Design a protein with these regions (language model features):
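N-terminal/domain-start alpha-helical segments
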Residues: 1-100
Length: 100
């Protein structure tokens, strides 16, 4: 059975490119445009990994990360162009396992 990865990324090109790379590596990938859509799916079917963009409309990636972490220990990677130490620490404190 393939490992399942959920991606929440509002930028279509990034979302589709990341999905394509991961699928080519043999993963099952469900990609979502919003954090809310990812949360709805995750609480119905658990993923093996979650990749979250931090800056999304609606429920942002940090909030999604915190909400996921309250209920699940699934590994979470935060994906963002924000690269300050403050952003990194905020992501880890919200429950992220890694920050790219």
């Amino acid at each position: 059975m393939k490992q399942l990865i959920y991606i929440a990324e509002d930028e279509k090109n990034i979302r589709e490119t990341l999905q394509r790379f991961l699928e080519n590596d043999g993963y099952e990938v469900c990609a979502f445009e919003t954090g809310d859509a990812l949360l709805g799916a995750l609480f119905k079917r658990r993923a093996d990994l979650v990749i979250l963009d931090i800056m999304m409309p609606g429920t942002d990636g940090l909030t999604c990360c915190r909400l996921i972490r309250e209920k699940d220990k699934v590994p979470i990677i935060l994906l963002t162009a924000k690269d300050t130490e403050y952003d990194y620490v905020s992501g880890i404190l919200q429950g992220g396992d890694d920050y790219l």
